[in-house]
Amino acid sequence: MSAAARELDIAPAAASAALKRLETALGTRLFVRSTRSLRLTADGERYLIHARTVLLAIDEGAASVMRDAQTIAGDLSLSIPSDLGRNVMLPWLDEFQALHPAIRLRIRISDRLADLYRQTIDVAIRYGEPEDSGMVALPLAPDNRRVLCGSPAYFKRHAMPKKLSDLQTHNCLRFVLGDAVHERWLFWRNKKSESVMVNGDRISDDGDLVRRWALAGRGLAYKSQLDVSNDLKKGRLVVTLAHYKGELAPLNLVCAHRLMLSPAVVSLRDFLRARLDQLKP
């Protein structure tokens, strides 16, 4: 019994207790025990034949899963923020599938946080650190920040702000995350944080819609730099108050457990990191 416990890396007392529970459940003795010997009873011999069959099936099942786990294939369910997903990542995911045609993607585009424990979602791409410390977060763009921006058309009608308090005279496009309106905008200057309470005539829980309002000249948006990188590059949006650093908005790939880090997930993480690095300002 002690040798079996050592092989299973458990205490001998735990092994004895487990055997006793099994015998109680079966209503029979499987072993004849003494202080010096241990041998199977007739019932134990019969039970062992079936137990070996079950253990073999378990080993074969584990081997099958492990073989699959070594290949970049199968179903992969993703949750991605609205603006980043629609306007940045969708073509990248097409590329990823072209590289790995055995992958089947299921994509949920939403700014609402998916419940990775209850919903059938393998991984989520999220801004910020997960509130649940039990989750695994792999950095994709750890240094990403928010930028304050507006369209050239907006700045033709309104003077560019020179200091944070000027934002109180601008139409600021606010975003809802969960049940909270993101209306206190945080910035950094000379290693000190400063914040300003903003107001405006539009609020949405869809980041893509906030960006579209900014493009249409409806107001100023405080967006992740990744979300608006293409618009900034092409001059459709312009950064203002650039002498302030925007609030950190690190992007992570999040999953409920480290066992979810299949080769497909790790490969996707590496692929996205390489693409996101190209968007750095």
Residue ranges and their predicted role:
Residues M1-R6, A13, K20:
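Residues within helix-turn-helix
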Residues R6, T24, A98:
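Alpha-helical residues within the helix-turn-helix
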Residues A11, A17-R21, W92:
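Residues within the DNA-recognition helix of helix-turn-helix
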Residues E23-L40:
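A short LG(V/I)-centered, amphipathic sequence patch enriched
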Residues T35-L38, E45, L56-S79:
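Short helix-loop hinge/linker segments at domain boundaries
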Residues A73-V136:
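Central regulatory/effector-binding core of bacterial HTH transcription factors
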Residues V88, S224, M260-A274, L279-K280:
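Short amphipathic alpha-helical coupling segments at ligand-binding clamshell hinges
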Residues R118-T120, P130-L251, Q278-P281:
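C-terminal regulatory
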